[in-house]
Amino acid sequence: MSRYRGPRVKIIRRLGALPGLTNKTPQLKSSPINQSTSNKKISQYRIRLEEKQKLRFHYGITERQLLNYVRIARKAKGSTGEILLQLLEMRLDNVIFRLGMSPTIPGARQLVNHRHILVNGHIVDIPSYRCKPQDFITIKNQRKSQAIINKNMNFYRKYKIPNHLIYNSLDKKGLVNQILDRESIGLKINELLVVEYYSRQA
């Protein structure tokens, strides 16, 4: 399944706020999952499916990519759900978004694809690059790159940067300080339902 490129507002009306996809927050349409349903019982499969879709659309990844992340998380020690979220949060495009360098993850992905971003002094043009503690995220030293990032930072500096990241506004340098904890996830999600959804596939 390819990456979604359709109307973003339509998605968040159905699934709720997905800050990685869009910063718009339209009024939610009535949803059988968001309100009590006396006449219709919602299947557990559908509930798990919608939680899975939240991850897909928020992080802007394909079905195959998400399944691969679940498989990696299952093989690691610890809570599969938390490790899955850590893997997604440590993607370079998401780190750029959480640092405030881009208003959305698709926007961050463009910055990476267009070679505006350096990791530890080297250009990285792979949005799925997995960042690790002590990685430095900087901007390419060109006027166009600097202008794009400065515009984003000035507009989105009101948003709080999570505890596992540090941004130095003077040097325009981001640092992955540590592996994030569950409380730092910027999305309302039940990751256990996602793991259950893939229980027969991963």
UniProtKB/Swiss-Prot annotation:
Task: Indicate where this protein resides in the cell.
Answer: Plastid, Chloroplast
Q: Name one GO molecular function term.
A: structural constituent of ribosome
Task: Quote the function comment for this protein.
Answer: One of the primary rRNA binding proteins, it binds directly to 16S rRNA where it nucleates assembly of the body of the 30S subunit.
Which keywords describe this protein according to UniProt?
Chloroplast, Plastid, Ribonucleoprotein, Ribosomal protein, RNA-binding, rRNA-binding
Protein family: Belongs to the universal ribosomal protein uS4 family.
Record-level GO BP terms: ribosomal small subunit biogenesis; translation
Q: Which residues form the S4 RNA-binding domain?
A: 90-150
> How does it associate, per the subunit comment?
Part of the 30S ribosomal subunit. Contacts protein S5. The interaction surface between S4 and S5 is involved in control of translational fidelity.
Query: How is this protein named in the record?
Result: Small ribosomal subunit protein uS4c
Tell me what gene encodes this: rps4
Highest rank taxon of the organism: Eukaryota
Gene Ontology CC entries for this record: chloroplast; small ribosomal subunit
Q: Which residues form a coiled coil?
A: none
> Which source organism?
Canalohypopterygium tamariscinum (Moss)
Which residue windows are transmembrane per the record? none
